[in-house]
């Protein structure tokens, strides 16, 4: 499943919409997403699953590039 993650780059930053970044990640669950991103110390605001029509829309209208976490 593909997830869209809204985050701030620094854990100490107060969330400000203009500074929010987005990445797309393939994972089995929201917990799996958070586990994979834990080592980056991001301030994760929201994790959203992207499926069906929403996924097609993101592919056509957004820069949907899956992040590879090693």
From Swiss-Prot:
GO terms for cellular component: DNA-directed RNA polymerase complex. Its EC number is 2.7.7.6. This is DNA-directed RNA polymerase subunit epsilon. RNAP is composed of a core of 2 alpha, a beta and a beta' subunit. The core is associated with a delta subunit, and at least one of epsilon or omega. When a sigma factor is associated with the core the holoenzyme is formed, which can initiate transcription. Belongs to the RNA polymerase subunit epsilon family. A non-essential component of RNA polymerase (RNAP). One of its GO terms (biological process) is DNA-templated transcription. One of its GO terms (molecular function) is DNA binding. Coiled coil: none annotated. Gene3D superfamilies: RNAP, epsilon subunit-like (3.10.20.730). The keyword Phosphoprotein does not apply. Pfam families: RpoY (PF07288). HAMAP family: RNApol_bact_RpoY (MF_01553). Keywords: DNA-directed RNA polymerase, Nucleotidyltransferase, Transcription, Transferase. It catalyses: RNA(n) + a ribonucleoside 5'-triphosphate = RNA(n+1) + diphosphate.
């Amino acid at each position: 499943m593909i997830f869209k993650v809204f985050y701030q780059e620094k854990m100490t930053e107060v969330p400000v919409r203009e500074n929010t970044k987005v990445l797309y990640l393939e994972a089995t669950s929201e917990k799996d997403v958070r586990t994979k991103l834990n080592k980056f110390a991001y301030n994760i605001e929201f994790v959203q699953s992207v499926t069906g029509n929403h996924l097609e829309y993101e592919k056509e209208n957004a820069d949907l590039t899956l992040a590879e976490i090693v």
